Each structure stands twice: as structure tokens, then as C-alpha cells.
UniProtKB/Swiss-Prot annotation:
This is Uncharacterized protein AF_1008. It comes from Archaeoglobus fulgidus (strain ATCC 49558 / DSM 4304 / JCM 9628 / NBRC 100126 / VC-16).
Amino acid sequence: MVEILLAFNIDVYVLMDEDPGNQSTQQLISRIRNLIGDKLFLQSPNLEGIFNFDQIRRDHGIQRNKFSKEIALKVLPTWFESNSVPPVYESLKNIIGVTNENG
């Protein structure tokens, strides 16, 4: 998809899990980085790691190992009440020029 968008001169930013140890993910990261350079943002080690999903699972009695849309919408608003925005999202927000409602 990145290559297609670039062919149409559409600016591309990619946010993806780093997944250390996953060789196919590392190859994909390398290919994408070669195409878009510093417009690749990695959730390190992955989305669940950034938000300490193991703790969320314990706190909320969640059985699954990954976020679902339903779980994210239920628990992340509370998570953000006591935690700051993870740096990878701040970096992405800043580079694409997103501002907070209050400025």
C-alpha cells in the first residue's frame, strides 16, 4: 500500500508494531523504512507493551492477549487519565501537525 500511495505522490506515514524477534516484521520494517525513511513510527515493543496490556488484563479480567476495538474503547480512556500519551504517538502527532483541542 505504501508503494501505491507514493506512486500517486501521496505523503505516507506508517505506525506499526516493532515486534522484536519477529523476522518477517523486521523485514517489513526494513522495506518500509527504505521507502519512507523517518515517516515510519514503531510501537515498541508493540501496542500491548506500550499500554502495559498485561496489567490491563489483570485489572479488568480480560482473557485475550491482544487489544480488540471493544477493549480499547473501554479501558484506554481510563488509562489516559493517569498516563501521558506514549512518545511514539506524540512524535507522530507533531510531525503531521495535529494539535490538542486547547491549542
